[in-house]
Amino acid sequence: MKPHAIGALLLSALLTGCAPHRYHAAPISPAATATALYSRSLDDPDLDQWMKGQGGFDAPSWPLPTWDLQSLVLAAYYFNPDLDVARANATASDAAITTAAMKPNPSVSVGPGYQGPSGAQPIAAFDFSLPIETAGKRGYRIANATHLSAASRLQLGQTAWTVRSRVRAALIDYLFSVKAVELLHREVDLRKEYVRLTETRYHAGEVPLPDLTTARIDLTSLRQTLSAADGHVQTTHAALAAAIGIPDSALMGKTLVWSDADSPPDPNSLPPQSARKLALENRLDVLGALEKYEAAQSGLQLEIAKQYPDINIGPGYSYEEGSNFLSLVVSSVLPLRNHNEGPIAEAEAQRKVAGAQLLAAQSTVLADVDRSRAQYAAAYATLEGATATVGELEQQQQSALSLLNAGEADQLTVVAAQLQTSVSERARMDALLQTQLALGLVEDALQRPLDSGVTSAFPKSAPRP
């Protein structure tokens, strides 16, 4: 075979065997993405279709007339950019499995030339080297990448739960801030009436000036509290929109509801202490730490396997002076100067770190479960006390009205009783808010919704490819 024929054959084989991916540009414009973010809407028909595919949700009409926790959480799963980042990271981790599974490519070398003083004698040489991995290195790489990919998928679930938790807390905060403003407006009206009646009695010489001054100061202070509460409504509204992943303007005009916010469950009805064991074994951060530990195990196995050198098998061919020569060369690295001790020691240390992180994650879960249950029980007890106080003051208010109707009390006494009831109602509302927030901490510790009627805690599919 002539040298030029050999070269043509090799070139043809190389070109046929190479099928590289083509680069596709994906330009991104900050101005365009900002416009897309600002144009997000809860009325988006694509959101409607995606929400229906999540199971347990059936919109009576679209756009929704009201938005509750279930629908707002689904909207957050659709819009929140943190989930997009987590999904992208999970996809990158999946791609790492492909990288780990790749086998090393063979190499080829061609060396044509001429021999003799006149260069009339052609020479052609062709060498082919096929690397062969030994000791199961490829399998350990795949196992390592697979466990890290699983950890990344679990982190996606962890991010989804965090999004749900933030939406829940933000919705509770907003609804209770609106309720606080309503109560404060009513209390301001009562304070005004109290000041008016006190002024009348002062001018009649029935009360001293300090009593009137105190009433006026209380009214001024309450108005300042109302002004701050109005600002808090706007702040919590914006916080809820941010938790969903939409601009504040997209949430304007939407009717937000939570039908059972006033009736949190009794602490005794919460999952029993056996739920601690379930959380210790199944919370996503624990499972993620376990996958990272298994990845560290595979990493250590890979470094140990690297003690055994790979083999290169190299069949060769040469043509010289009209004769064909075949050869077979087997080569390998001689592990004389080191046996990969350093990387093995690092991998062993990384496995210890991963084991310690798993234990720390379980310890955190245990503390979270116990602390959140205790915090909820305390908040619920405070709520019960505040509810009882409201009931007592409402009875006193009714008694004052009865005395007024019987001519045995004046209007100021009734207004004073109404003010006491109003203050106690605000205290009860604050206790209810703290109870609901504490209940959210219990859900976070167990990483599952305590209301069986709500939708899944995690999205079933990605809203975008």
Language-model segments: which ranges?
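Amphipathic alpha-helical coiled-coil segments and their boundaries
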Residues: L72, F79, A86, P131, ...
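Small/polar, glycine/serine/threonine/aspartate-rich low-complexity segments that form flexible
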Residues: G55-T66, S109-K137, R141, L251-S269, ...
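A glycine-/polar-enriched beta->alpha junction
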Residues: A75-D84, T91-P106, S118, F126-N144, ...
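Heptad-repeat amphipathic alpha-helical coiled-coil interaction surface used
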Residues: A90-A92, I97, I142-N144, S149, ...
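Periplasmic alpha-helical coiled-coil/stalk elements that build and connect Gram-negative outer-membrane
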Residues: R138, L154-L278, Q375, A379, ...
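Terminal intrinsically disordered/low-complexity segments used for targeting and assembly
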Residues: M1-A75, D230-L278, L441-P465
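Transmembrane beta-barrel architecture of outer-membrane proteins
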Residues: S71, I123, A169, T214, ...
